[in-house]
């Protein structure tokens, strides 16, 4: 059985070497869908009876391990030195420094790496 839980969050970023609008500072409303596969629990009297995993637990783990950190943060590549210097000059600014350029593909791969071990 597969189950999916969708969460949304807002973050800013830029793709520094891109040739179009993406090189400018901007933000998105991101959606992450977490799909888990497993057997349905068949345990009479258990609060998990009939579930693969409690949806509230899926949400809690995602928030603790990814969403709360990235929500309303600016995701910046470590190599984007001008932007990184600027963001570091802002007191209390929520900045997440990444080892990769924050493209949708790289963010998806990072999210998978962070969350895959959480749900095992």
Residue ranges and their predicted role:
Residues 1-120:
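Charge-rich, low-complexity N-terminal segments
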């Amino acid at each position: 059985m597969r189950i999916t839980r969708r969460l949304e969050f807002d973050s800013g970023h830029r793709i520094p070497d891109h040739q179009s609008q993406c090189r400018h500072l901007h933000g998105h409303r991101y959606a992450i869908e977490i799909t888990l596969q497993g057997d349905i629990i068949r345990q009479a009297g258990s609060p998990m009876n009939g579930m693969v995993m409690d949806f509230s637990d899926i949400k809690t783990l995602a928030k603790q391990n990814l969403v709360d950190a990235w929500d309303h943060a600016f995701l910046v590549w470590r190599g984007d030195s001008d932007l990184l210097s600027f963001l570091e000059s802002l007191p209390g600014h929520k900045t997440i420094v990444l080892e990769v350029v924050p493209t949708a593909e790289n963010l998806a791969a990072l999210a998978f790496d962070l969350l895959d071990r959480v749900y095992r």
